[in-house]
UniProtKB/Swiss-Prot annotation:
Biased composition (Low complexity): 44-121
Disordered, as annotated region: 1-127, 598-628
Biased composition annotated in UniProt, kind: Polar residues: 1-20
Cross-referenced InterPro entries: HrpK
Record-given protein name: Pathogenicity locus protein HrpK
Entry superkingdom: Bacteria
Coiled-coil region list: none
Biased composition (Basic and acidic residues): 603-614
Organism: Pseudomonas syringae pv. syringae
Lineage, top ranks: Bacteria, Pseudomonadati, Pseudomonadota, Gammaproteobacteria, Pseudomonadales
Length: 641
């Protein structure tokens, strides 16, 4: 990451800029609350009530994996991919090195004379690729069939094996150096192994040793990151696990990735130093110009070179004044990747759906220049394209999330009001709606297709969602979150996650019959349906949810009431209408009781009752407002058509 205090030129003329005191993020990008109320009751990032499940003629709860995969991989000439660089071909995790003829050591620096797969066998079968040495790669190849894992680990280990072997005397050292020279990213990475910075073309034994040690340390740190994630999220879905695995591959290869940009190489025009940052340009060069490197690494590079994914890692781990000083710059470093795995990676299918929608939204506006736009965008909106206005909206929403995160530092009310007004205008703009409703599904499909392993995981999860297996897993996770302060499990996150994943299916598989959330619920065993209904009674008919929310430190009664209503709406999206109607009076009575029993609640009641003394519900309650999808970056939402 590069640190810059210079805001986007466009923003200064569009809305008053927040001060550094307002810009402080305590939560990752997709977790920031981007609504004025700041309330949200679900575990997933999608706010219920803004994504509707339209009825379909779904005839069963499962689609075959092969048919879904076929729908996902089907090429579509009508899809626009102008905002995503499509030069990078799909890379198989088991891609072998180039099959060109064996090169002599003196010609090995020419990529056209790259070592073949059989040439690399001297590394794969050496003492430097022993079972003990390969253990560090096990978490990164665990997704592969058992018979493929050892070879994939050997390919990932090649840079380390080559560096150690090149320090020997004799023919093996020459072969190892030929391999290093044939792979430009590896050559530059070894060149700067000891002292970093400038590649001078002089590779010493100290450089070789330092590089090998750096790679081993990076891989070991990646293992720790994955282990921590697995410990914290034992019920993570296949898609989220695949994202974490891919991120771990990148984390383990950071010494290579940071050196992959062609501008870092000896003799490059406009030569730059290796500075610990990774860019999309560097990742694309790693894929295209390094025939001896692992196919698994290239597949990971292909994924993280996508603008939407790269942007999410760019700011991972930044908080407080570091966040305030940082402008998104489309580069990341090792600490960003570790922080993303440990703290920002999705933990369930609903969070994955939100993350993918956010990434697709960013992809949709990547490369759209708004640096010369100003307030005319709002005063004369017809003069600008939907793409331009969408790019401005996303930029404002990114600013908005930082401002909201800085509420504890100062009063941000005026700044938020200005942002909210501008964002609302763009959200309601038909051109913006039309552009994003077309481009986001296209970009979601493009992002999933960028990695064949992710594609497989998405198809597997779709089957889990439609069968109800994913819902049951998320319900079990919610049960484990119960403690003395929160004695009643909250299943609203599991239900909103279900809705988010079904919406994602509609985007990814436009020709498939996708069930509604209520259809999935109705196909669950009686004990699952009863479990959710009983939870509704405890949380809403008996007031448990509101009681827990009001009991939290620094809780606001109005926001607590809104959050409880959001949670209630999630349950009601799947429960039978006659059951919900039968609980309505109990809900009203318990809500009034909990508010009256709380000092915060009593204060709220003074301003929230009408002349007859009846409680007046928040006007933005999902139970009362339209369920149309809104464009809201950070929650995976957009306007439906």
């Amino acid at each position: 990451m590069r640190i810059s205090s210079s805001p986007s030129p466009a923003l200064g003329s569009i809305v008053n800029q927040p001060t550094s005191g307002e810009l402080a993020a305590e939560t990752p990008l997709a977790k920031a609350s981007l609504t004025q109320s700041g309330a949200g009751g679900g575990q997933a990032f999608v706010q219920f009530g803004q994504a509707n499940d339209s009825p379909s003629s779904f005839s069963g709860t499962e689609q075959s994996g092969s048919s879904l995969m076929s729908l996902l991989t089907r090429s579509s000439s009508s899809e626009s991919t102008s905002s995503v660089d499509q030069d990078s071909d799909q890379v198989s995790p088991m891609t072998s090195v180039s099959s060109t003829a064996s090169a002599s050591p003196t010609a090995a620096s020419n990529p056209a004379n790259a070592p073949s797969a059989t040439d690399a066998a001297f590394l794969d079968n050496s003492e430097y690729s022993s079972p003990e040495a390969l253990k560090r790669w096990e978490p990164m190849v665990a997704n592969l069939p058992p018979e493929e894992r050892e070879q994939a680990a050997k390919e990932l280990n090649r840079p380390i094996a080559a560096a150690w072997m090149a320090r020997e005397n004799g023919p093996n050292a020459e072969k190892a150096m030929a391999f290093i020279n044939a792979n430009p990213a590896l050559k530059t990475a070894v060149d700067v192994g000891k002292d970093g910075g400038n590649a001078d073309g002089k590779i010493t034994n100290k450089d070789l040793k330092a590089f090998a040690k750096n790679m081993e340390k990076a891989a070991d740190n990646a293992d720790k990151d994955v282990a921590k994630y697995m410990e914290d999220n034992p019920g993570a879905d296949p898609q989220s696990l695949e994202m974490v695995r891919s991120a771990a591959v990148m984390r383990a290869n950071m010494p290579l990735a940071t050196a992959a940009d062609p501008h870092h190489a000896v003799g490059a025009a406009d030569k730059t130093d290796v500075d610990g940052n990774v860019s999309a340009e560097g990742l694309k060069a790693l894929i295209k110009s390094n025939p001896g490197l692992s196919g698994t690494l290239k597949q990971s590079s292909n994924m993280w070179s996508q603008a939407g994914f790269l942007s999410q890692v760019d700011e991972a781990g930044l908080t407080g004044r570091k966040k305030a000083a940082h402008s998104p710059d489309q580069v990341f470093d090792a600490s960003n990747m570790s922080e993303w795995i440990r703290k920002s990676a999705p933990k369930n299918g609903g969070q994955f759906a939100s993350m993918l929608s956010d990434a697709a939204t960013l992809n949709s506006v990547a490369g759209i220049d708004i640096s010369k736009l100003n307030a005319q965008v709002f005063e004369k909106p017809k003069a600008y394209t939907g793409a331009q206005k969408a790019a401005v909206m996303i930029k404002l929403q990114q600013t908005q999330q930082s401002v909201i995160a800085g509420r504890d530092l100062r009063n941000t009310e005026k700044t938020e009001a200005g942002l909210n007004e501008r964002i609302a205008q763009l959200q309601a703009d038909p051109d913006v709606q039309e552009y994003l409703n077309k481009s986001i599904p296209e970009q979601e499909r493009s992002l999933v297709r960028s990695d064949s392993a992710l594609q497989k995981a998405v198809t597997e999860q779709a089957q889990n969602v439609n069968s109800g297996k994913a819902l049951q897993t998320d319900l079990a996770t919610a049960d484990k979150a119960v403690d003395k302060h929160n004695p009643d499990p909250d299943y609203s996150g599991a239900i909103t996650g279900l809705s988010a994943q079904l919406q994602l299916q509609k985007d990814l598989f436009p020709d498939a019959q996708v069930p509604t959330a209520q259809q999935v619920f109705n196909n669950q065993p009686d004990e699952v349906q009863t479990k959710i209904a009983d939870s509704y009674v405890r949380n809403f008919s008996e007031g448990g949810a509101l009681k827990q929310l009001l009991g939290q430190k620094k809780s606001d009664a109005g926001e607590s009431l809104q959050t409880a209503d959001n949670q209630k709406a999630a349950y009601e999206s799947v429960l039978p209408a006659d059951f919900v109607n039968g609980e309505r009076e109990s809900y009203t009575a318990s809500t009034l009781s909990e508010l009256q029993n709380s000092k915060k609640g009593r204060k709220l009641l003074e301003g929230k009752t009408d002349e007859e003394g009846a409680l007046r519900w928040p006007s933005s309650s999902p139970s009362k407002v339209s369920e149309a999808r809104r464009i809201q970056f950070g929650h995976g939402l957009r306007v439906s058509v």
